[in-house]
């Protein structure tokens, strides 16, 4: 079996990381400015992060949210206090695509609508609804067309305000 061809690959085999650098299999060092998948904003192999992850992995690596998990409750409490939104609910998920997918569903539940504004050249993930609001026809399959999407130019605030005010009665949300 081979890996699915998702992106054209750079000819770099990254084998380790430390701090803000990654290293390839030839020993070359690169400043890691990647801002995509599963970004580790504390840097690679940060000692505190490694210590806490190792401790947790030695206790329980994962379990369903269908049972009480005091760590999740503690996290929600801390985030609520730190953000000033302690009367909100925290929905823990796995990825940005899943976050986008569920934000679209929550907006649709709330508005009862299914038309969304997204922005040109955007990428929101590979789940079905996230693909539908991604401005890349190459990855949108017929099954993804479950709601209408209008693409507007990124950073054209006037066009966005005009469209959203004119179409407010039709819109589920603006991504």
PLM features per residue range, with description:
Residues 1-21, 56, 78:
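Active-site-adjacent loop/helix segments that line or gate small-molecule/cofactor pockets in enzymes
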Residues 24-25:
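Short, acidic, Ser/Thr-enriched surface-loop or helix-capping motifs
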Residues 163-168:
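Conserved small/polar residues in nucleotide/adenosyl-binding loops
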Residues 171:
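Extended, polar beta-sheet/loop recognition surfaces of beta-rich domains
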Residues 14, 45, 71, 152-155:
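Short secondary-structure boundary/capping elements
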Residues 174-175:
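Hydrophobic alpha-helical segments, chiefly the membrane-spanning helices
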Residues 77-162:
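PLP-dependent aspartate aminotransferase-fold enzymes
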Residues 29-113:
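Glycine-rich loop-to-alpha-helix module at the N-terminal edge of alpha/beta enzyme cores
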């Amino acid at each position: 079996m081979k890996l699915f061809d998702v992106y054209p690959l750079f000819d770099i085999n990254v084998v380790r990381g430390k701090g803000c650098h990654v290293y390839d299999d030839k020993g070359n060092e690169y400043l890691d400015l990647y801002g995509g998948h599963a970004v580790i904003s504390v840097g690679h192999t940060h000692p505190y992060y490694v210590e806490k992850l190792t401790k947790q992995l030695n206790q329980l690596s994962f379990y369903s949210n269908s049972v009480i998990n005091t760590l999740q409750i503690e996290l929600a409490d801390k985030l609520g206090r730190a953000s000033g939104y302690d009367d909100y609910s925290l929905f823990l998920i796995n990825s940005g695509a899943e976050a986008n997918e569920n934000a679209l569903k929550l907006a649709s539940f709330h508005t009862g609508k299914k038309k969304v504004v997204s922005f040109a050249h955007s990428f929101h993930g590979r789940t079905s609804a996230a693909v539908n609001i991604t401005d890349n026809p190459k990855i949108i399959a017929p099954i993804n067309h479950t709601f209408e999407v209008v693409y507007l130019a990124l950073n054209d605030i006037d066009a966005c305000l005009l469209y959203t005010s004119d179409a407010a009665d039709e819109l589920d949300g603006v991504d």
